[in-house]
Amino acid sequence: QVTLTESGPALVKPKQPLTLTCTFSGFSLSTSRMRVSWIRRPPGKALEWLARIDDDDKFYWSTSLRTRLSISKNDSKNQVVLIMINVNPVDTATYYCARVVNSVMAGYYYYYMDVWGKGTTVTVSSGSASAPTLFPLVSCENSNPSSTVAVGCLAQDFLPDSITFSWKYNQSQKISSTRGFPSVLRGGKYAATSQVLLPSKDVMQGTDEHVCKWVQHPNGNKQKNVPLPVIAELPPKVSVFVPPRDGFFGNPRKSKLICQATGFSPRQVWSLREGKQVGSGVTTDQVQAEAKESGPTTYKVTSTLTIKESDWLGESMFTCRVDHRGLTFQQNASSMCVPDQDTAIRVFAIPPSFASIFLTKSTKLTCLVTDLTTYDSVTISWTREENGAVKTHTNISESHPNATFSAVGEASICEDDDWSGERFTCTVTHTDLPSPLKQTISRPKGVALHRPDVYLLPPAREQLNLRESATITCLVTGFSPADVFVQWMQRGEPLSPEKYVTSAPMPEPQAPGRYFAHSILTVSEEEWNTGQTYTCVVAHEALPNRVTERTVDKSTGKPTLYNVSLVMSDTAGTCY
């Protein structure tokens, strides 16, 4: 095996000579056609060839440095020595030696360096040698389970510029996911940084409070403990959800108690169990991070206990206990003592959107009922002010985690009916209600109608020059009321809503009572350059025929009219 190892001083004073030794093995310079070269790489610059010596003692130098260089070999020691005189700071570099071999092709000799040493760093400075001073670098951002946590170390005021960083967990397990950055000369001394990227889940779930940074330097090795980011410590909120009265099934009749611990951090939960003597029938899910847009990461966990109806009605007390960070949190539940929870039935009457009316040619009325303890006795009905009852379809949801149900009652009226001038009432009855609950909706009156202005903006030339994508913008302004529908088409065919983004209507700053919105369609630059047409269809109740459109393509570069009557649904919704 061929190896080459460079050695020499790490720090040299200006105007002094520099002597570097290359010790090699695996070949001999007394063998024909064997050669050794010296090369250097100054900081931030390309490699620079310096000198070469051959097996027959012939030597060659760089033209710019030949007056300052000498090269010699010692066959008995397998060494090549390079001497550079009158050094100065520009000679600061990493110096390499490499074996040079040659081959003959088509009558020509080709020389190449096939094996290199690892290099030795030489700093030319009038300053005194000094070991680095270390400073920890800690991330200030909140940790996210799907991201990484960055910590680092700043090494400062060291000379010469020869430093090696390594990271370890608890002084034992080596960390490989590191990044090094080039040294920087500042005030005659050097500074360098090293960074390590750790998975957030390891930081939040592990027991390590710091990582160890080892720094090797010719003037002394040093160690620094870098603390890991502090994770917010939050206690769990423990809730128990009891089964509904009709929630027991089978033989013997059984149901489930659900215990949920939420909002805690860090992740570790030492135990989650119901009662003291429960040995079976318990299923505990894995701890999961809660979905949050901001703030510290918190966690939740759910445990389910299967219980018999006889035990539940026999006044047994069930206790869910959670141990977290040395503290105990618990919640009791029994058929005689139900945990406090808001179980009042609520009713929401949801008016139809203009988009649904425009697309289906019918007006759908929706009545949502929540927090039902049972579903078999619920009834939902819609009535109109003038013509009485409207046929209503009712759908029941599956049981929610808090052991309640929800139901939806839907009714449709024909679009031609006078929705704007009539009141519609949703009526809900249930055995838990002393009297029916009612919610009434009608279209707001007195709203001025203003039809929208539609502008279609082609892709910007600067974006097309990048040859990546093309963004077409549809700007809709000055309309009232705020309910508007926007759809994109390509060559007369509707595009999937996943392919574009439409903003919510927003008030016009200079026109009170009016609104604006925009929709953005992004296609590939290749598609745009084929000349395909793209159409923005805008529907609003103030428009003639309720719809208008603008079309653009590469050849026109400006919007034109386009017949998009097919965008409207061919099948009207069913009216009752």
Curated annotation (Swiss-Prot):
Disulfide bonds: 22-97, 153-212, 259-320, 367-426, 474-536
Annotated spans, Constant (C) domain: 125-576
Keywords from the UniProt entry: Adaptive immunity, Cell membrane, Disulfide bond, Glycoprotein, Immunity, Immunoglobulin, Immunoglobulin domain, Membrane, Pyrrolidone carboxylic acid, Repeat, Secreted
Residue span of region Variable (V) domain, involved in antigen recognition: 1-124
Gene3D superfamilies: Immunoglobulins
Glycosylation positions in this chain: 74, 170, 332, 395, 402, 563
Modified residues (Pyrrolidone carboxylic acid): 1
Main location: secreted
Domain of life: Eukaryota
Single GO BP term: adaptive immune response
Subcellular location: Secreted; Cell membrane
GO cellular component, one term: immunoglobulin complex
Subunit-structure text: Immunoglobulins are composed of two identical heavy chains and two identical light chains; disulfide-linked. It is found almost exclusively as a homopentamer in the serum. Membrane-bound IgM molecules are non-covalently associated with heterodimer of CD79A and CD79B.
Biological function: Immunoglobulins, also known as antibodies, are membrane-bound or secreted glycoproteins produced by B lymphocytes. In the recognition phase of humoral immunity, the membrane-bound immunoglobulins serve as receptors which, upon binding of a specific antigen, trigger the clonal expansion and differentiation of B lymphocytes into immunoglobulins-secreting plasma cells. Secreted immunoglobulins mediate the effector phase of humoral immunity, which results in the elimination of bound antigens.
Protein name per UniProt: Immunoglobulin mu heavy chain
Lineage: Eukaryota, Metazoa, Chordata, Craniata, Vertebrata
